[in-house]
Amino acid sequence: HAVGGGLEIAMAADIRIARKNSGKVGLPEINLGVLAGTGGTARLTRLIGKAKALEMMVTGELMSFEDAHACNLINHIWEGSPEDFRRDILDWCSQFTLPNKAVKAVGNIKRSCQTGPEIPFEYHLALERELQAALFNSTDAKEGIAAYVEKRVANFTGN
């Protein structure tokens, strides 16, 4: 389950993955006479939209992982066994780390995506250009471009 504060913590993550048929999500704080005040109202609204977030929080109802996936609160539902879940997810996540991806590029993508919606569009474009310019000077960008031209898999080092 990811309920209350647990969901508030999960919503701070870049990607949320749940194991199929293993729980529910929700912010039932209304049933205690309070609100999800550790980023819950702000993050849920941004993730799933105002109307669905309001409905979820004012009813206090929990939703299945499948329903949470349908409204983009969960990115992926994993069908593996409970015993293999952690290992499978760590294996899956390795695609975003060295040597498979350039970590500076991953970081800059995250920065642009997280900051962009909070600033005017033209500033977002300027931020994107600034982040891209910094990446073009990296060893990893040179490796990635060379690997593409040479039709081979890049071996990123984090530089």
Spans of model-derived segments:
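CoA-thioester-processing core
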Residues: 3-57, 88-92
